[in-house]
Amino acid sequence: RPSFCNLPVKPGPCSGFFSAFYYSQKTNKCHSFTYGGCRGPGNRFRTIEECRRTCVG
């Protein structure tokens, strides 16, 4: 799995409300969160399928 999968989830500094997904190393699963729309770490995916394919394996 890519190292960015282990980055902490952060919504970013903007105030948008976008549905996104992140990988949790603790649970070895992808979870949803609200993304603000800009910046934030690389542990962010548009779909749960993309998150699973990239980080879960």
UniProtKB/Swiss-Prot annotation:
UniProt-listed PROSITE patterns: BPTI_KUNITZ_1, BPTI_KUNITZ_2
Name recorded for this polypeptide: Mambaquaretin-6
One MF annotation (Gene Ontology) recorded for this entry: serine-type endopeptidase inhibitor activity
A single cellular component GO annotation: extracellular space
Alphabetized CDD domains for the sequence: Kunitz_dendrotoxin
Cystine connections: 5-55, 14-38, 30-51
Chief location bin: secreted
Function: Interacts with vasopressin V2 receptor (V2R/AVPR2), probably in a selective manner. Inhibits vasopressin binding human V2R in the nanomolar range (Ki=21.5 nM), and also moderately inhibits vasopressin-induced cAMP production (IC(50)=574 nM). In vivo, intraperitoneal injection of this protein into rats increases diuresis by 2-fold, without any loss of electrolytes.
Compartments where found: Secreted
Domain notes: Exploits its two major loops and engages more positions in its interaction with V2R. The pharmacophore defined by numerous amino acids positioned in loop 1 (9 to 18) and loop 2 (34, 39 and 44) may be at the origin of the absolute selectivity of this protein for V2R.
Domain of life: Eukaryota
Keyword check for Secreted: yes
Tissue: Expressed by the venom gland.
Domain BPTI/Kunitz inhibitor: 5-55
UniProt organism field: Dendroaspis viridis
Family label: Belongs to the venom Kunitz-type family.
Annotated Pfam families: Kunitz_BPTI
UniProtKB keywords: Disulfide bond, G-protein coupled receptor impairing toxin, Secreted, Toxin
